[in-house]
Amino acid sequence: MKINLIAVGKLEKEYLNLYLSYLKKISFFATINLIEIKEINEKNIDLKKQKETELIIEKIPKNSKVYLCSLQGQEKTSEDFSLLFNEDNLTFVIGGSNGVDESTFLHKISFSKNTFPHQLFRILLVEQIYRSFTILKGIKYHK
C-alpha cells in the first residue's frame, strides 16, 4: 500500500522525531511518501491559495484517491477512518496556513472542528494512520 502526504511547508525539527517514530511503525504496513510544497510568499490570500493548490495538484500521483484534511470535511471516528485504508493508493493533503482552494478537492475529511497548527496536525495524521492499521490488523493499541 502507498500513502502520500502532501503538505505545504516544511516539518520543523521539534516535530521530526515523533513524526519519524510513527513512520517507522507504519512501515510494517505501508510506505509513506511525504511531499512538501514550498509555501508561496504572496500577500493576496486568494492568489496564494490558488498557487499552492496548483502546486499540490501537480504532485498528486496518478490513480491515487485524494483526501483533503479540512475543517469543512466529514468527521470520522478512528474506526471509520481506518476503512479508508482498504484502498491501495491514498493521498492526504494538508494545506498551508491560509488553506487551499477547497472546491478543487472531491473528498474532504476532518479530525475535529478545532484548528491545529499544521506542524502538529502532521503528527496527528500519521498517528491516526498508524492507529488505523492497528485497528485493521487487530493489534492492541486502539482502545
Curated annotation (Swiss-Prot):
Belongs to the RNA methyltransferase RlmH family. It catalyses: pseudouridine(1915) in 23S rRNA + S-adenosyl-L-methionine = N(3)-methylpseudouridine(1915) in 23S rRNA + S-adenosyl-L-homocysteine + H(+). Keywords: Cytoplasm, Methyltransferase, rRNA processing, S-adenosyl-L-methionine, Transferase. One of its GO terms (cellular component) is cytoplasm. It comes from Mycoplasma mobile (strain ATCC 43663 / 163K / NCTC 11711). It comes from the Bacteria. Its main location: cytoplasm. It is found in: Cytoplasm. It holds the Pfam family SPOUT_MTase. Homodimer. Specifically methylates the pseudouridine at position 1915 (m3Psi1915) in 23S rRNA. It is an enzyme of class 2 (transferase). PANTHER family: METHYLTRANSFERASE, RIBOSOMAL RNA LARGE SUBUNIT METHYLTRANSFERASE H. This is Ribosomal RNA large subunit methyltransferase H. The keyword Methyltransferase applies. S-adenosyl-L-methionine binds at residues 68, 95. Its EC number is 2.1.1.177. GO terms for molecular function: rRNA (pseudouridine-N3-)-methyltransferase activity.
